[in-house]
């Protein structure tokens, strides 16, 4: 598998086309960002850690019958994925009140929600990822409206799987975000990554924030 050209470089990853047109290589960067990429800091080993965690989670989800774009881990900082038609929508699942949820609704940080809450955001650094509903998604053509209920269903299933894994390690899964796309086969799948960059994790006994993020 050979890299052909750089397709895109984002805050945390570089995406490369390969000599197989339906496959891409994701290279994770040793860079931490905040405030929509305004603040940046190089952290040695971050890329390999995110690649390792994301690869492991994708493999676990695939074992549970959840489709992802993941094919295999190639190296410390690289993974091979299926090329997908990505939807510019972030799907956030919340188990506890934190981040923008606290600012929007005035709920005390750390409050356990009665049930997992799924929210949708338009993926746009320029617009600071505005919150959207299914009607926005339909009118703005962010994703096929008929797929939104399935995205929510998958997100809740992922939540149950990850919550159990983290709780066994003494970690609370406060919230996390997913991105979705359509594979060459036409199947709906989770794309991008699932790593500490896309989660908020707290120590179960102390409430300490394990991962500092400006997301969701």
From Swiss-Prot:
Entry's EC annotation: 6.3.2.6
GO biological process: 'de novo' IMP biosynthetic process; cobalamin biosynthetic process
PANTHER family, A to Z: MULTIFUNCTIONAL PROTEIN ADE2 (PTHR43599), SI:DKEY-6E2.2 (PTHR43599:SF3)
Reactions the enzyme catalyzes: 5-amino-1-(5-phospho-D-ribosyl)imidazole-4-carboxylate + L-aspartate + ATP = (2S)-2-[5-amino-1-(5-phospho-beta-D-ribosyl)imidazole-4-carboxamido]succinate + ADP + phosphate + 2 H(+)
InterPro entries in alphabetical order: SAICAR_synt/ADE2_N, SAICAR_synt_PurC, SAICAR_synth, SAICAR_synthetase, SAICAR_synthetase_CS
Family: Belongs to the SAICAR synthetase family.
Lineage per the UniProt record: Bacteria, Pseudomonadati, Aquificota, Aquificia, Aquificales
Entry keyword Metal-binding: no
Listed name of the protein: Phosphoribosylaminoimidazole-succinocarboxamide synthase
Keyword Transcription: no
Keywords: ATP-binding, Ligase, Nucleotide-binding, Purine biosynthesis
Gene Ontology terms, MF aspect: ATP binding; phosphoribosylaminoimidazolesuccinocarboxamide synthase activity
Source organism of the structure: Aquifex aeolicus (strain VF5)
Gene3D superfamilies: ATP-grasp fold, B domain (3.30.470.20), Phosphorylase Kinase, domain 1 (3.30.200.20)
Top-level lineage group: Bacteria
